[in-house]
Amino acid sequence: LKEEWDMTIKYMTTSFLGDELLGVETMTVNQHDVLVSSPERAILECLNLPDASSSLLDIYYIMEGLTTLRPKLVQTLLEACTSQKVKRLFLYMAEKAGHSWYKALKLENVNLGTSRFMITPTGKYINKYNMTISKELAEYE
């Protein structure tokens, strides 16, 4: 899609959040209405990207700045999310970043499953989220 914005916009869809419009908002740009992911949905989409495991520290840098996420929308998205990997990574990063909205989440309503995930072949095991992540991310402060 290339219009008068002097850029190419790549349209992508995902199904891991169920309802395709959950967490999607309308933004007006140059008198055009465009559907965009809310920050709450966008960070989950980043974690769902096929190459996300190679850039988890970069995604964590983004997570650190997401201080104003809406807990009710985050809760709804997490409950709708079908990817246990995405949910575990999101919750790990939110907790690690110390976001106040994290404390408002009802984690007992979020199904994290029981299987163990190895995001990276070598790294640090995070018992609470039953996953192995890169040492770089685990040790970042």
Give short role names for the model-derived ranges.
Residues 21-141:
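Hydrophobic alpha-helical interaction segments
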Residues 1-19:
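Short gly/ser-rich loop at a beta-strand->alpha-helix junction or flexible surface loop bordering the NTP-binding
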